[in-house]
A protein has these predicted regions:
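Auxiliary Fe-S-binding modules of radical SAM enzymes
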Residues: 2-29, 178-244
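Canonical Radical SAM [4Fe-4S] cluster-binding loop centered on the CxxxCxxC motif
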Residues: 4-9, 25-64
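A secondary-structure boundary/capping signal
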Residues: 36, 86-87, 115
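Residues that line or immediately flank small-molecule/substrate-binding pockets and catalytic motifs
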Residues: 51, 87, 133, 205, ...
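Short secondary-structure transition/capping motifs
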Residues: 58, 88-92
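Residue-level preference for long, well-ordered alpha-helices that form the structural scaffold
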Residues: 62-65, 152, 221
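Conserved AdoMet/S-adenosylmethionine-binding subsite of the radical SAM
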Residues: 70-75, 79-82, 91-217
Length: 244
């Protein structure tokens, strides 16, 4: 299925950097594939996929395609529940709305990892969203420090409002390292989310793979402290700590 959007390019034009054919952890409660979309407007200090940042493919690297994803989904009927579009920033690609609809028409649920743009166009067709909280929501300087982009939080605030009004299940998640996220800033972030009735929050401790834009040391297993973790857990229906 080629999947045309009424006001945009066909699903076949989606720029896919790579595919993970099976995962149990990227789409809560579902067995899913992950489609990594090429291109990202952010330059996050903790980025582990810097080769996906440009919209054009690196000629020295292999990449995937819509046809490969389509073939995978045809073979995996009855074995997979859904597809997660990740990146990069999947909402940057104008072919995403058509791709989301095409995947739904094949009988799969669709999840999205985003931190955001074009969210309103695809939200009605989504079953779940993982929304990146890249910095303290009300602190523009912190967003600029973490993402490398001025006024980065403006679109994020708009997207949080869309999600809260939509009824679509979603998780807010923060990837943190003590070099750029203090314990006080973690608590400030959690308080902001609780005040807006966010139910599901995850803290992801920054790992240290090769290729990071900034070089960080390994995070002490005792960070953040247990008292801070207890405060983070309170007030959310679901709190998840991810260290791997």
């Amino acid at each position: 299925m080629n999947g045309h959007d009424r006001n945009g390019p066909a699903a076949s034009e989606l720029k896919l950097a790579g595919l993970t054919p099976f995962t149990t952890i990227d789409f809560p409660g579902r067995l899913s594939a992950v489609a990594f979309v090429q291109g990202c407007p952010w330059r996050c200090v903790y980025c582990q996929n810097s080769w996906m940042q440009q919209r054009s493919f690196d000629p020295g690297l292999e990449h995937s395609s819509w046809e490969e994803l389509e073939s995978l989904l045809k073979r995996r009927h009855g074995l997979l529940d859904g597809v997660v579009f990740s990146g990069g920033e999947p909402c940057l690609d104008p072919a995403l709305p058509a791709a989301v609809r095409a995947v739904k028409e094949m009988g799969y649920e669709v999840g999205l990892h985003t931190g955001p743009a074009r969210l309103a166009e695809v939200l009605p067709d989504l079953s779940w969203v993982g929304l990146d909280v890249k910095a303290v929501p009300a602190d523009g300087a912190h967003w600029a420090k973490v993402t490398g982009v001025e006024s980065a939080q403006d679109k994020w605030t708009e997207s949080l409002g869309l999600l809260l009004a939509s009824g679509v299940p979603f998780e807010c998640r923060t990837t943190a390292h003590p070099d750029y996220f203090s314990e006080a800033q973690l608590l400030e972030t959690a308080a902001f989310l609780r005040a807006r009735n966010v139910k599901d929050y995850a803290l992801q401790i920054c790992r240290k793979p090769p290729g990071l834009i900034a070089r960080f040391g390994a995070v002490d297993p005792a960070w953040p402290s247990e008292p801070v973790l207890e405060k983070l857990r309170s007030g959310f229906e679901r709190f998840t700590l991810r260290r791997d």
